Amino acid sequence: MTHNAPPRLDPRRTPLVAVAAAGFLVALKGTGAWMTGSLALGSAALDSLIDLFVSAANFLVLRRSAQPPDADHAYGHGKFENLAALGQGLFLVAAAVVLVWSGVRRLIEGGAPRQTGWGVAVLAISLLVSLGVAHTLRQAAERSGSPALRADSLHYATDLWVNGAALGALLVVRWTAWSPADPLVALVVAAYVLRAGSSLALEAMGDLSDRGLPEQELRRIKAIVASFAPRVVGLHDLKTRRSGGQRFIELHLEIPRATSFEDAHALTVEVLRAVERELPRSKVFVHGDPV
């Protein structure tokens, strides 16, 4: 008896799910913010509006980055994903600044949300939608290694905190009539969004500037090479970088001078395949140097 695995959504089409969900959440939260006057709910609506633009951009970027290398882009088009991730991070930082300004202004000028029951219902629905979309995007990001999809999944994971915090603020106002809870929660959300956006932008800038792979992955590469001793004496000039969801790894093997040309070539291929098995989605270049 065989069991068929459930169909998986093409990672290049996954952003369409995010676009549809973000559009729904913008309309839902925007209406709720207008009805209640809640700054916390308004901040959640702004966050979803950013998600809408970002998810739409990701759909276009993933189609572009999936194209094979060509004469003008010999190493592929993965950097488009890093550019998209950088843009998303900067969008989040900008949104956080707007939230801080709005929160401080509300604390100074005063004011309280109205019809909080509607706001509670809107945020409860938003939590469920964000949870489902975040799970879908995270799975797609893990399968594809896409920075753009990972960034999008981070947005919806952030939405869970944003929606939860806004929901808590409205419940406090509803039950205690303590109106400062609304702008205070908006400021807390702003701090969280600022941290997430900064981290995302810095990581994208690192990839765009060809920062090397993490030390943990470098140790794995060196361990693989060491496992071929004594046929391999050592390695040098290990160079790594990431472009989109793909790693690029270049290294020089130190091979005993007595090794024949044919054996040395076969050995470099063995090492190359071993590294690719250990680190999927890697483009590996191995050179053999006699010592």
Where are each of the predicted segments found?
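Alpha-helical transmembrane cores and adjacent cytosolic helix/loop segments
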Residues: M1-Q216
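Peripheral (non-transmembrane) domains and long loops of multi-pass membrane proteins
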Residues: M1-V17, D72-F80, Y192, A196-V291
